[in-house]
């Protein structure tokens, strides 16, 4: 049976990406197949893989065809999480496709991935 494994994000700096994503999503960096060009991040509760990081020299796409949606349980929690992610190195994205009164915020990771 076919199943989705995990999303893989292209990054220019593996250690920086590991630091950001482990802190952002409470993940744990796996040593399995770890290298200068690859790192797997697992769920902290041991339930499996969560995210792959692949070293890439190509720039992040300004309007990628695939992105990650991260959810919170309330607008207040969303505001707290956005501030926390910005403090970790994420950046706000000047995105011109917000609907009136959006319930989401577009951020980029330290590599510019939206």
Regions found by a protein language model. Give the residues of each.
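Residues in well-ordered beta-strands of folded domains
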Residues: 42, 52-54, 69
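Conserved beta-strand in the GNAT
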Residues: 49-54, 106
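Vicinal oxygen chelate
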Residues: 13-15, 63, 68-111
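Core segments of cupin and vicinal oxygen chelate
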Residues: 2, 8-50
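A short linear hydrophobic-aromatic micro-motif
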Residues: 28, 52, 91-95
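Short connector loops at helix/strand junctions that flank enzyme active sites
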Residues: 46-48, 61-65
